[in-house]
């Protein structure tokens, strides 16, 4: 029996949470905005996306996630407009915008000080703000000591251009080195039922250091919403069509994971996406998932995940469906940008002034 028609209570309350230990407070679920402008097919109509963001903020989801490489640049412009419109409508609501730097429009990774500063200035301009709430290094430049990149970010904090610093796809050792220069507020990682390798070192390191965890792609890039049939519905220019897990030889085997999750969702009276998202929420009060969508209906369904309760036995059962030996295919293809597995940087002693 399919669970598509069943939903958890639509009026789920979106609680607030402390993200990290530096004072940042956000909604316990965020909104990933990438797909509104880039990567997942063609750019969506601006008016529709502004309406979606306003709907999200009115519902209590006030933590918006973007990056300068989405578009490139157009997603930041959209989020800036939409966030401002939402804030104007919901006068007592504080909208937090997180953006990122480090991936150039040519899909190269850079973390040198001059680039960091120029990227920040560009994001401030496109977002239409005087200060960025949370500024992530999107990917780690393996040619620049992370201390050098962090040093420039620290200056930007001191100048009032950013409030909090984050890292994305960073290893535990890189996180530790960066945190010495300036406290890291949040680390963004891919964390979902079928992407759990971060649990060994990265998650414990974040918790040891008081760093919040932002889980991107918590629905497996849409896989846990509709399973293998998702790929048949994607346009040719959708990024997911190139990913190993979505290739026919892997997708056929991964389809069984979705079917088991979907069956459990039917038993619990929720959708498969709500169940998978609830699993991420149950990882701890320091974890903020940021599912993305371009449809208000899907957004409402995602918020409903906050009302889904899971027992320890149910958590274990879900995890058994998507254990490491069951999931077929890597997260990215081998030629893609740096992930946390290749985010180590040279020692600080190797850097010379003027590099």
Curated annotation (Swiss-Prot):
Protein name: Probable aldo-keto reductase 3
Cystine residue pairs: none
Positions contributing to NADP(+) binding: 217-227
CDD domains given in the database record: AKR_AKR13D1 (cd19145)
Family of this protein: Belongs to the aldo/keto reductase family.
Enzyme Commission (EC) number: 1.1.1.-
Enzyme class: oxidoreductase
Active-site annotation: 70
Keyword Transferase: no
Keywords from the named record: NADP, Oxidoreductase
The keyword Metal-binding appears for this protein: no
Gene3D superfamilies per record: NADP-dependent oxidoreductase domain
Database matches in Pfam families: Aldo_ket_red
Coiled-coil regions listed: none
MF (Gene Ontology): aldo-keto reductase (NADPH) activity
GO CC list: cytoplasm
Residues reported in the UniProt entry to bind substrate: 138
